[in-house]
């Protein structure tokens, strides 16, 4: 895949993200990924249990661990940043790797809470794979342990 082809794919994914955001905003819904740290608020959890590396269904990934980059993605993890951004360049490089011999090899890191997953590391890898129609993604998973589960 050439750089020009990767840029074309990024622009298509960007339009999908913009369209999704507009649709969700029109319905009065949050257009960005959910944020686990905000959901947990204060003291709901007593830690995380390492579950290991699993293939998880992409449809169960609903958010991110922390709020740091939520405005870079639509709720469905399509990109929202300008094509000239460093973010876009990295997304396009992953696109080229995915379509080339190299592939996307490294698992993402995510947290599982109440059956849903929240990405800590690997948002762009998830975005590229989802854009290309992947249904599962390798992930290092940590399960959030709620206070009442430890009693």
What are these language model-derived features?
Residues 1-120, 124, 130-131:
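Short, charged/polar connector segments at secondary-structure boundaries
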Residues 118, 136-141:
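Short hydrophobic alpha-helical runs that function as membrane-insertion/retention elements
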Residues 145:
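Nucleic-acid processing machinery
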Residues 149-150:
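Conserved small/polar residues in nucleotide/adenosyl-binding loops
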């Amino acid at each position: 895949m050439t750089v020009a082809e990767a840029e074309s794919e990024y622009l298509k994914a960007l339009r999908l993200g913009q369209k999704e955001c507009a649709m969700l905003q029109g319905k009065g819904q949050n257009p960005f990924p959910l944020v686990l740290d905000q959901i947990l608020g204060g003291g709901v959890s007593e830690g995380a249990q390492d579950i290991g590396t699993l293939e998880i269904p992409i449809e169960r990934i609903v958010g991110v661990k922390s709020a740091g980059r939520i405005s870079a993605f639509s709720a469905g993890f399509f990109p929202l940043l300008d094509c000239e951004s460093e973010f876009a360049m990295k997304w396009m490089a992953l696109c080229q790797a995915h379509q080339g011999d190299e592939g996307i090899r490294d698992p993402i890191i995510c947290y599982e809470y109440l059956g849903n997953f929240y990405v800590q590391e690997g948002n762009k890898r998830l975005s590229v794979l989802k854009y290309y129609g992947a249904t599962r993604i390798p992930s290092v998973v940590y399960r959030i342990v709620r206070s009442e589960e430890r009693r």
